[in-house]
Amino acid sequence: MEGESKGLIVGISLGLVIGVVLAISALFCFRYHRKKSQIVNSGSRRSATIPIRENGADSCNIMSDSTIGPDSPVKSSKNGRSVWLEGFSKRSNVISASGILEYSYRDLQKATCNFTTLIGQGAFGPVYKAQMSTGEIVAVKVLATDSKQGEKEFQTEVMLLGRLHHRNLVNLIGYCAEKGQHMLIYVYMSKGSLASHLYSEKHEPLSWDLRVYIALDVARGLEYLHDGAVPPVIHRDIKSSNILLDQSMRARVADFGLSREEMVDKHAANIRGTFGYLDPEYISTRTFTKKSDVYGFGVLLFELIAGRNPQQGLMELVELAAMNAEEKVGWEEIVDSRLDGRYDLQEVNEVAAFAYKCISRAPRKRPNMRDIVQVLTRVIKVRHCRKRQKNSPSPSPRLPPPPPIVEESEGELTANGSLRSEIHRRDNSLDSSIAEDVIL
C-alpha cells in the first residue's frame, strides 16, 4: 500500500514537470515567431516610397525608396502596421464602387514634383498643385496621417463626392490609398479660396456685385445638398476657406470631410466644425441639421458684407449693427471699408437683414436654402433691372430722338479690373439663366 502511494506521487510529479517544460517551450516558440514576424514587417515598411521635398530642375524625375524616418508622413501603430492601412482593406471595395478613379502613388509623386508644389495647407493636410501625364492640372490633398479622424474623413469625401455632382460643388476626380498615404484629387480651382480674396493683400478687393454672385453660387450648392441629393447631405463646415473659386470666379463648395447624410447619426458625441461658424443650437444639443448649415451660411454672408473673419469679432459687430438696423444706418456701419463706398446701400441692407434671419438663435425661424436662393436671385434681378433703367434715356417729346446708346464698358461695371468681364457676362445672361440650376 505504501509502495503504491509513492508510485502515485512520483507519477504526478513527473507529469507536472513535463507540463511545465512543454508550457515553457510553447511560450518560447510563440515569442520567437512573433519577433521574426515583426522583423519581416519592419523590412517591408522600409521599402515604402516617401515624398522628397527637394527643389531643383530635376526634382520631378527623382523617386525615393528611402527608409522611413521620424519626419516621414507615414506613421506606424504599435503593432507595426500603418495607421492608415488599419481596416482600409475592408472598405476598399466600397470606395471602388463609388466610380471614382484610383491613382497610383508614383503617378502623383511625379505629378507634384515629389510633393514640392505646395499651394495650401488645410485643416486635414497639405494641398499640392499637380500636372498629370495627360496635361490636366489638378489639386492633390494629402490627408494628415496623424489625424485620428483622417481615414474616416477620407472615406466620407470619396463616398459622398462619388455621387454628388453639381456646378457649385468641387468635383472629386480620384483618390489614392497606397503606401500608407491617403490622397484626394480634385479639379484645380485656379482662383483659390474666398478667404484669400477677402483677407489677402495680394488680391484686389472683391466688388460688391461679385460678392452677391458668390453668395448665390454657395447657396445653390447647399440647396442641392439639402434638397437635390438623395439622401440629403449636411455639409457641417461652411466657411470662406472652404469656398473655392474657378477661373471665371464661380464659387464652389469644398471639403466634405465632416459632411453627413441627413438620415445618418444626426447626434454627435464631439463638436466638430470651425469656431465662429458653429450653430449655437448644435453646440448645446450636439445635434446638427440643415438649419446648422443655414447658420453657417448666414455667418458667411456677413463675412462677405464686412470683410471680417468671424474669429475676429465679426458677430459682435453684427449684433451691435442689428440694434441700429431699424434706423437704416446699422448695416452700413459694418460694410467692408475696402469697397470704398462702391455698393448699393439698399441692396446691402436687404442682404444683411436676410443674413440676420439665417443666424437666428431659434432654428425654426431660419429660412431654408431654397428660400435663400430665391431671395438672392431676386436681389440680383432687381439690380439688373436698375442698371437697365439707368442706361435707358428718359423719354422727352420736346427733344429730338436721342442718339444710339453706347453700351456701358465693362470697366464701369465693377472696380475689380480682372473680374469685369465676368460680371458683364453674368449680367447679360441673367434673364435666361438666373433661375437655372444645372446639375452636371
UniProtKB/Swiss-Prot annotation:
Q: Which residues carry this modification: Phosphothreonine?
A: 274
**Where is composition skewed (Pro residues) in this entry?**
394-405
Q: Where on the chain is Phosphoserine found, per UniProt?
A: 241
Q: Which organism is it from?
A: Arabidopsis thaliana
Name of the protein in its database record: Calcium/calmodulin-regulated receptor-like kinase 1
User: What is the role of this chain?
Assistant: Required for cold tolerance, via the activation of MAP kinases activity. Phosphorylates and activates MEKK1 in response to cold in a calcium-dependent manner.
- Tell me the keywords, alphabetical order: ATP-binding, Calmodulin-binding, Cell membrane, Endosome, Kinase, Membrane, Nucleotide-binding, Phosphoprotein, Receptor, Serine/threonine-protein kinase, Transferase, Transmembrane, Transmembrane helix
- Membrane topology type: Single-pass membrane protein
Task: Give the annotated active site.
Answer: 237 (proton acceptor)
Segments for region (Calmodulin binding): 28-228, 369-440
List residues traversing the bilayer.
8-28
Q: Which residues carry this modification: Phosphotyrosine?
A: 186, 282
